[in-house]
Amino acid sequence: MIIMEEIKIYCENNGMHYSFPMGTDLKTISDKVCPSVVCKGSENETDVLAALVDNQLKELSFKAMSTHSIRFIGYDHPDGRRTYIRSLCFVLQNVIREIYPDKVLVIDYSLPSGLYCEIREKETMQDGKPKVYFATDDEIEKIQSRMREMIESDLPFKKTKQTLEDTVKYFESNGQKEKVNLARSLGRLT
């Protein structure tokens, strides 16, 4: 008989203590003890997007291996909002890569109510500046529709580790020159 070691979890959202098998991920814990969080200043609820585990931000795939104090967070929390926006960026990146395999999405900088993004050709103009692709209204609608489909399919995000060399090769093959330059600036490439 195999005995699973139990760990203690304190959920700050409801002030309750729980026991879970060691290695249980935060999504499973959230589903059982705190499936949604109440927004501050209102009674509206939002999905759990991440968690503060002993006051450190963790994604929902994080596996709890020891006793922790956990606070599940949603969109109303600054870290929850950043998690949500970053997730949308990954979805948009995948959709652009799918619809325009010969182009690159560049998420350039933050604006007060969003992010400034450009779809660029992989090749630069003669003066070295990036050549921007301007999507039509129909193309934007197609991008939005595909993003919705991808989100509704509820595919998980999978984090992988790669060597710096493999990462640079990947960025080079996708025409992401800024990321290649950033990686090279770390000085760890031969």
Model-derived segments and their meaning:
Residues E118-R120:
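Short hydrophobic/aromatic beta-strand micro-patches
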Residues L111, E123-T190:
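Non-catalytic interaction/regulatory segments
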Residues M1-C89, N94-I96, Y100-P112, K122, ...:
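Ubiquitin-like/PB1-type beta-grasp interaction modules and other compact soluble beta-rich domains
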